Amino acid sequence: MEIGTARLSEDLLAQFPHHLIGIREVPEIFSVGDFCTLARFHINETLKRERIPLLVGGTMFYFSALLRGIPNLPAADPALRERLAHEVRQSGLDTLYRRLQKMDPVSANRIDPNDRQRILRAVEINILSGKQVSECEHSDGLDKTGVNVSRISLSVSDRRTLHRRIDDRLRQMIDAGLVDEVRGIRSRYPQSRGMPAMKSVGYQQVWSHLENEVDEGQMIADIATATRRLAKRQLTWLRHERGVTWFDASSQGLVSSVSRYLNAADISIMGH
């Protein structure tokens, strides 16, 4: 998975070493617990070398778990899960999602309305624990270790500019061979459509196209819509985060502004 994830080129990866890229195959599960364990290992190794780890990415749930710890959640209940799945089959996923919005609006706001697996799990947690997911006790995260984690985020103030950039990036991915990339994955792992990796924006829409469920034009429109929704959820999440320093992504002096901020700050770990 390279084109749809905007993976850096091998030259850039050689010039700027990254961790946790390309470490799993498509059918393999990579849980938030797996991520936190590996991320903390590489963070500690980087700090031992007296360097500042830079955490870069867009998966806010994983970043939050790394900072605050992983919620101590109740184990899955197969009988309850099947009951909820039956409800979805009978009434549709949107009905269960609306139920989640009433039970746990914070979690609902963070979950894609089409993400069946996460919606089922969130409702299950609320029922089993009697609490919202955010109210469950957390294991220790980086925020409790004494390190200074500085958070920065980039914003695009004009929504039209943001949507234009999304459309431009989508066209670049299509031109770079996104459809062929998914076709290759589908050929190697024909049973992987339901895996978390294939639910990523872009991959699931292309898979639908390859199954002749939608034509190319609809596929492109669906990817654009899903990407805009994802961007909106990410911005909503970040706006509720405490201690985030914002920079205008359209600013001509963006690089120098961020550099000045980094040089002036007392930072142990940098999150972006």
Annotate each predicted stretch with a short phrase.
Residues 1-272:
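Phosphate/pyrophosphate-binding catalytic cores of soluble transferases and nucleic-acid-acting enzymes
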